[in-house]
Amino acid sequence: MKKGKMIIISGPSGVGKGSVNGELLQNPDLRLKYSVSMTTRKPRNGEINGVNYFFVSNEEFAKAIVNDELIEYAHFVGNSYGTPRKYVEQELKKGNNVILEIEVDGATQVLNKEANVLSIFLMPPNLTELANRIRGRQTEDEEKIKARLDKALLEIPLKHNYQYVIENDNVANAVAKITDVLHLEGLTDIKTPTVYERLEQIVEQIVKEKYMYFVNNWETNVKLLAKNEEEKNKAKNFDAETYLIKLLTKKVYHKVLGHGDFSKLLDKDFVDFKIQKLMFKINFFSVEQKHYNNDEF
């Protein structure tokens, strides 16, 4: 049986991790299990021990750290949070994927220690909306809300440490994005093509219809500019059409994950508009696109 994977869904407090995960867990094709965290904070109204959290004392939490019973842990606003190791490892062996709904500090620990991980950072649409969501819970005073917002300002720049950055503008849109990411990563039982694969077909159509002149010139340019044997070999084997299609597909996909209506990725006019802007950023005189992973691309 293929081993499951730890799926980190992290982001600042109030971004909506719980709401998104609750919807994801309803889909049996995702093979998801929820890792119940351990915490020293008091239960909120409606929270159940062993379901929402394992509520423990400070002494019990400290003992779990000493005994290496936690995959990660963090301390914040006078409380401690951690992920019990035993349950996660049991579910992974069964072939299930385990959601770790954790704060950014804990996610950083897991990313530094564990290899079998898929990491997703949930972004709020803006800081005003984040503040509204935290206040909407009506569980904390203004001092604690301010502390959470201050921490969010430090956490959001760390989003680049994650494999995927996904905006939670509304739960349905965020769930659709994460579902496709899990499908793309081969972690589901879904049989239909991914949105990414269907997007790639649309991009291929657009490139063939509108950009083959640039493709052909690109291949010619890199051959003419090759200065040494290594560059000449790269130029000789350079398939500009395939490279451009994959490059544009990845950039359009990730841009919409980060902001936008996910269903638009199957709208040819929308994709065409995105590609028009991206084409200005490509260096048609080099095989290497040094700014490829840059947000400015």
UniProtKB/Swiss-Prot annotation:
Pfam families: Guanylate_kin
InterPro entries the record matches: GK/Ca_channel_bsu, Guanylate_kin-like_dom, Guanylate_kinase, Guanylate_kinase_CS, P-loop_NTPase
EC number(s) recorded for this UniProt protein: 2.7.4.8
UniProt key word rRNA-binding: no
Primary enzyme class: transferase
Molecular function (Gene Ontology), one example: guanylate kinase activity
Keywords: ATP-binding, Cytoplasm, Kinase, Nucleotide-binding, Transferase
Residues that bind ATP: G11, P12, S13, G14, V15, G16, K17, G18
Catalytic activity: GMP + ATP = GDP + ADP
Domain Guanylate kinase-like: from-to ranges: 4-183
Positions of the UniProt region annotated as Unknown: 204-297
GO cellular component: cytosol
Subcellular location: Cytoplasm
Job description of the protein: Essential for recycling GMP and indirectly, cGMP.
Family listed: Belongs to the guanylate kinase family.
HAMAP family documented for this protein: Guanylate_kinase
Name of this protein: Guanylate kinase
Species of origin: Mycoplasma capricolum subsp. capricolum (strain California kid / ATCC 27343 / NCTC 10154)
Lineage: Bacteria, Bacillati, Mycoplasmatota, Mollicutes, Mycoplasmataceae
Gene name linked to the record: gmk
